[in-house]
C-alpha cells in the first residue's frame, strides 16, 4: 500500500504534523475545513509566482477564537511582502474580508528550495509549459535535488508526452525512496502542467532520510544532512507508470 497512498497523509501523526491546528468544538470543524481551503486558495491565487511550499493555519487559543495565525513558507518572500509591505497588507486585508476575523500573517523564507517536492514539481510544470523535453526536465530536477542534499528522488510524468497521440506515464529515479518505511521522511507533491497538447500530471517524491527516535523532520531536512546509511548508491533508472519492473538506464 505504500506505493499507492499519499506519503504525506500516511505519515501524519507518526513523523509529520498537520498543516491546520485548531482547538475547537466538533460542530465547528466542517466550517473551518472550508475556511482553510478558501484561505489557501486565496493566498496561492494572490501570489502565483511566489514559490509557496506550505501554508500553516493555527487557531490554538480558545480565548482568541476570532484570531487566525497564518504562516506562509516561500522561496521568494519579497514577492509576498512587496515594497514597504504593501503586497502583504493587501493580502491581509483580503484575508480579513474573507474570514471576518483578525489575521496575523507570517512570511517565512525557505532557504533550500531545490529539496522541496512541491517547488520542484511547480518548476517542472513551468518548464514543460515552455515546451522543454520531459526527460531533460526530470533529470535536471533530480540532479538539483541530489546536489542540494536529498538522499533519493523519484519523478513521474503522465499524459501526452511529447505530443504523442496515446497518453502514457514515464518516470526517472535516483537513490533510495522507501515508501513502505513509515519513519522515512518522504516529501510528496502532485502538480498539473497545462500544455498545448493537454494536461500533464507531475508527481515528485523526495527522500530526506530516516527520522530516528528523539529526532524530528527538521533534523532530516537540514541542508546537506549527513548520510549515515550504509546502502550503496543505486543506478539511475527509468520506469513506466503502472509497471513495477524497473528498467536500468542505458550505459553511456
From Swiss-Prot:
**Start-end of Polar residues biased regions:** 241-252
Instruction: Give the UniProt entry's GO cellular component terms.
Output: cytosolic small ribosomal subunit
Q: Which domain of life is it from?
A: Bacteria
Sorted UniProt keywords: Ribonucleoprotein, Ribosomal protein, RNA-binding, rRNA-binding
Instruction: Give the GO terms filed under biological process for this record.
Output: translation
State the function annotated in the UniProt record: Binds the lower part of the 30S subunit head. Binds mRNA in the 70S ribosome, positioning it for translation.
User: Which HAMAP family does the record cross-reference, listed alphabetically?
Assistant: Ribosomal_uS3_B
Its family remark reads:
Belongs to the universal ribosomal protein uS3 family.
The protein's name: Small ribosomal subunit protein uS3
Could you tell me the gene encoding this protein? Answer: rpsC
Amino acid at each position: 500500500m505504500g506505493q499507492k497512498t499519499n506519503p504525506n497523509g500516511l505519515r501524519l501523526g507518526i513523523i509529520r504534523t498537520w498543516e491546520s491546528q485548531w482547538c475547537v468544538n466538533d460542530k465547528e470543524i466542517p466550517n473551518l475545513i472550508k475556511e482553510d481551503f478558501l484561505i489557501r486558495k486565496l493566498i496561492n491565487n494572490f501570489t502565483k509566482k511566489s514559490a509557496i511550499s506550505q501554508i500553516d493555519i493555527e487557531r490554538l487559543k480558545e480565548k482568541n477564537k476570532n484570531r487566525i495565525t497564518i504562516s506562509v513558507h516561500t522561496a521568494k518572500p519579497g514577492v509576498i511582502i512587496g515594497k514597504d509591505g504593501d503586497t502583504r497588507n493587501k493580502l491581509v486585508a483580503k484575508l480579513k474580508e474573507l474570514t471576518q476575523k483578525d489575521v496575523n500573517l507570517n512570511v517565512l523564507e525557505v532557504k533550500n528550495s531545490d529539496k522541496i517536492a512541491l517547488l520542484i514539481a511547480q518548476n517542472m510544470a513551468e518548464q514543460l509549459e515552455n515546451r522543454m523535453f520531459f526527460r531533460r526536465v526530470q533529470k535536471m530536477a533530480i540532479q538539483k535535488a541530489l546536489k542540494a542534499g536529498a538522499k533519493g528522488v523519484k519523478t513521474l510524468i503522465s499524459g501526452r508526452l511529447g505530443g504523442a497521440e496515446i497518453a502514457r506515464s514515464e518516470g526517472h529515479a535516483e537513490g533510495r525512496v522507501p515508501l513502505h518505511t513509515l519513519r522515512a521522511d518522504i516529501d510528496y507533491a502532485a502538480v498539473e502542467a497545462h500544455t498545448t497538447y493537454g494536461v500533464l500530471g507531475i508527481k515528485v517524491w523526495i527522500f530526506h532520510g530516516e527520522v530516528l527516535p528523539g529526532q524530528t523532520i527538521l533534523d532530516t531536512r537540514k541542508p546537506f544532512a549527513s548520510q549515515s546509511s550504509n546502502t550503496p548508491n543505486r543506478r539511475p533508472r527509468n520506469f513506466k507508470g503502472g509497471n513495477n519492473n524497473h528498467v536500468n538506464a542505458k550505459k553511456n
